Amino acid sequence: MNELIEIEVVYGRPDKQVLLSLSVPVGSTLEDCIKLSGITTHFPEIIPSEAMVGIFSRADKLSSIVKAGDRIEIYRPLTADPKEMRKLRAAKMSKK
């Protein structure tokens, strides 16, 4: 008999956030859980096989196995290069 564990899948945009709780079979990967959650019905822009993901704010691989109680977070792509943004802020501060 396939044992089930409880996990959560979360994703958010500035205008909408969703947290889904679900039961998945032991041995499921992060990618499996994203697909099983149905979160793509809320956010069609998510491509499960290409998503950047993590568990409790720590980046992880789609092939990682989940544990009971894990919160799988799907991350949005960066809109700006962090290094460039730091340079711009530093330049702005030096002008003051």
UniProtKB/Swiss-Prot annotation:
Instruction: Note the InterPro entries from the entry.
Output: Mopterin_synth/thiamin_S_b (IPR016155), RnfH (IPR005346), RnfH_sf (IPR037021)
What Pfam families does the entry give?
Ub-RnfH (PF03658)
Q: Where is the signal peptide?
A: none
Q: Matching SUPFAM superfamilies, A to Z? A: MoaD/ThiS (SSF54285)
Q: Which Gene3D superfamilies match?
A: RnfH-like
Q: Which HAMAP family match?
A: UPF0125_RnfH
Matching PANTHER family = UPF0125 PROTEIN RATB (PTHR37483:SF1)
The Swiss-Prot or TrEMBL record describes its family as follows: Belongs to the UPF0125 (RnfH) family.
Name the record gives this protein = Protein RnfH
Can you name the source organism? Psychromonas ingrahamii (strain DSM 17664 / CCUG 51855 / 37)
